[in-house]
């Protein structure tokens, strides 16, 4: 059954898909063992639609709509729904959408985003592995 994009149910399914791709994502981090961070992902044209994914040493441990405290968020990416969908469906790389300004880095350093563009691309590609209801 299709889950609403970035809903709690969707995040649960997405974590399973991400974990299936975990080895591919891990090897793409600049420093996987040091990648212990929380990423915030939000839908700019649907305020309040936000998920957080937590990594510990380059491996996902939590993907949730129960948000972490802001001081724990290392990077925040915000995009309209159509940009997230384009990246999820393989029509565009997430990192290219960041460079084009369609996915905005609203917290964190662009240097870190660039250094970890490949794992971010693979992470967002995993969205396509979740049966998604894009009507949010």
What do the PLM-derived regions correspond to, one by one?
Residues 1-136:
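Feature captures hydrophobic
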């Amino acid at each position: 059954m299709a889950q609403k994009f970035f809903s709690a149910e969707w995040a649960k399914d997405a974590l399973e898909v991400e974990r299936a791709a975990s080895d591919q994502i891990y090897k793409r981090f600049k420093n996987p063992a040091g990648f212990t961070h929380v990423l915030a992902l939000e839908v700019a044209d649907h305020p309040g639609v936000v998920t957080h994914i937590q990594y510990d040493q380059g491996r996902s441990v939590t993907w949730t709509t129960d948000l972490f405290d802001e001081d724990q968020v290392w990077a925040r990416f915000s995009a309209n729904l159509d940009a997230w969908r384009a990246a999820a469906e393989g029509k565009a790389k997430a990192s290219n959408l960041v460079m084009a300004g369609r996915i905005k880095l609203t917290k964190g350093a662009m240097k870190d985003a660039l250094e970890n563009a490949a794992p971010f691309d693979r992470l967002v590609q995993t969205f396509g592995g979740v049966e998604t209801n894009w009507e949010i």
